[in-house]
């Protein structure tokens, strides 16, 4: 009986959270960002919380924005349309480092941190850069 009640509560909570996420008005700055960098995709879901705003596009690209609508993270790992993060979003120093040290690698995730950057390549490597674009960590 407890399992049935738990399952029912879980389904109701999921349904409410999905309904709330879909009914949120998207800020024009976020819409403009999507139209500029992901013109072949549309916003599927917007999920704000106390720290940031998560956005999922209809091609499964995931975006994360700070509360001031500044983009924070772009994740194209599961995108059905975009094979990599748009090059316009990637700092030139990071692109140069990846091209020089990982020829043919594609940047699937890009995150702006407060003190640097973090990327994930299509080969599974994660690289962290400080604010001067020096690699501080490589993780596989």
Model regions and ranges:
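Structured core of small recognition/catalytic domains
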Residues: 1-5, 135-140
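Bacterial Sec-dependent N-terminal signal peptides
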Residues: 1-24, 34
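Interaction-mediating elements
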Residues: 22-139
